[in-house]
Structures are given as C-alpha cells and as structure tokens.
C-alpha cells in the first residue's frame, strides 16, 4: 500500500508520542521533499523532525512533475508547497491514500481522485485495529499539546464514530 503524507499528520502524531501508529497502520509513509524541508529546516524544533531524518519507514521522494505542483499551487484552493507536492506525489505514485489535515488541500486532493484521510480518520482506524484503546484521550492531548484545532461538532461526531461519549 502506497501512502503519502503531508506535514501535519506526522507533526501532530509525533507531538503526542503516537507517530508509530502510521507505521503500524501503513508500514511505510512517503513524503515529498517540501514536507521534509518544512519539518527539518523550520528554524525551530518541530515534532517529528528527527524521525523523518532517521526512521527507515518514512521515505522522502522527489516530485517528477514540477509543473503539476505549480498548477496545484496556483489553483484557487490556495495551498502551500508541502500540500501541493504531497498531492502531486500521491498522483505520481498512484497512492492508495493521502494523509492530509488542511481542508483546502483535502478538497483539492479529493477533486483529483485521491483517497484522503486526516488525523482523526487515522485515529479512528487505529482504534478499529486495536492499536489504541480510546480516541478521546489522544484527541484531547492533540488539542492540548499540539494545538490541534477542530470544532465541537466534529469532536462529538468523531467520538460518536469511535463509540465513545464526549
């Protein structure tokens, strides 16, 4: 299974000590060079920066079609370089899944025919596979430690999907 990730699923999971969920769920994650650069050359410590440099199951790959990246960035969705490269790489590799949290990038990825899931979808899948006992404590920790933002309705919906009360 080819899975491409944008920055935020990696940094958020690393911030709460749950990065290994990606390996357990997908075995290997591919990130574009722009995502690697966002994390490693940020000028300040970023959760997951050391891991993307050292873990063999996170692979960095360059984009072949730079014109596609430019077209994605100039689209009306106003996405950043990391998101554009993640979408382009997922298309190039014919990835089964793109991991991305930013709404505009998710919408653009889906409009390109990609299967896209975000951090909350990852956590729901991890619970279904028995990798975490509960979603709520992880989401609460993401909100507290990683400044993860989600509205209350989505919070309630996710907990309902997980079979957990608020």
Can you describe what each PLM-predicted range is?
Residues 106-166:
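Acidic, PIN/NYN-like endoribonuclease modules and their adjacent C-terminal/linker elements
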Residues 1-97, 103-106, 110-114, 153-159, ...:
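Active-site-proximal, substrate-binding regions of enzyme catalytic domains
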């Amino acid at each position: 299974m080819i899975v491409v990730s944008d920055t935020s699923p990696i940094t958020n999971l690393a911030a709460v000590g749950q990065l290994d969920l990606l390996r357990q769920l997908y075995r290997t994650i591919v990130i574009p060079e722009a995502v690697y650069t966002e994390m490693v050359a940020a000028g300040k410590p970023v959760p997951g920066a050391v891991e993307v440099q050292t873990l063999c199951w996170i692979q960095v790959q360059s984009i072949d079609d730079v014109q596609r990246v430019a077209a994605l960035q100039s689209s009306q969705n106003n996405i950043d370089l990391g998101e554009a490269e993640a979408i382009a790489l997922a298309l190039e590799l014919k990835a089964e899944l793109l991991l991305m949290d930013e709404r505009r990038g998710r919408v653009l990825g889906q409009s390109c025919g990609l299967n896209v899931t975000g951090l909350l979808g990852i956590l729901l899948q991890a619970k279904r596979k028995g990798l975490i006992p509960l979603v709520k404590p992880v989401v609460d920790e993401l909100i507290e430690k990683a400044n993860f933002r989600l509205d209350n309705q989505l919070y309630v919906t996710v907990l309902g999907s997980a079979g957990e009360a608020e």
